[in-house]
Amino acid sequence: MKILYLAPIPYDGLRQRPQYIADGLAQKHEVIYVNPTVSWLKYFLKGGDCPWGYSGVRPSGVQVIQLNGAIALPRFAEGLWSGFGFPERLAIKKWLHSVDIVWIGFEPWYDLLKHFNGKMVYDLMDDNTKLSTNPLMRRLIVRT
C-alpha cells in the first residue's frame, strides 16, 4: 500500500508521534512523508528550514519531501484567503493519483484535498485553536 502522509511537523525535527507513525507504517508500506511547507517569508523572518524543496529516503524507508515554498505565503495568511495553498495543491496533485491513502496530520492540509475522493485518515494531533496565538491561524483552523 502507498501512503501520502501530509505531516504536521518536519520529519527531521524533534521526534514526536507523526514520525513514529510514519516509521511504523513504512515497515510494511511505502510512505511519502510531506513536511510542512516553509514559505520564503517565514524563512526570511524566522530562519529555520530552507524554503527550497528537497527529497530523500530515511533509513526507516520513509521518503521525506519538502515542497518548494519559494512562491508560498506563510500558513497563517490562508486564514484570509484559501487560494494561498494553490502551489501546494499543484505539488501534491501528482501523488494523489498513485497513492492508496492520504494521511492528514494538520488541519490546513485538509483544505488542499477538498476534491480528493480516495481514502483519507485525519489524525488530529492537538486542538490547535487553543494552542495558536495567531488570530489568522486560528481562523484558518476553524474554517477547515
Where are these regions (language model features)?
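Flexible, charged surface loops at secondary-structure boundaries
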Residues: 26-27, 58, 94-100, 114-115
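Active-site proximal beta-strand in glycosyltransferases
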Residues: 103, 113-130
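Short, basic, glycine/proline-bearing loop/turn elements
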Residues: 2-8, 75-78, 122-131
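Membrane-proximal helix-turn-helix segments that form the acceptor-binding/catalytic region
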Residues: 87-94, 115, 127-144
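An aromatic- and histidine-rich active-site surface loop
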Residues: 84-89, 101-116
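A conserved catalytic-core segment of Leloir-type glycosyltransferases
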Residues: 39-97
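Short, charged/polar "capping" segments at the starts of alpha-helices
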Residues: 39-44, 109-112, 132
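N-terminal subdomain of nucleotide-sugar transferases
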Residues: 1-50
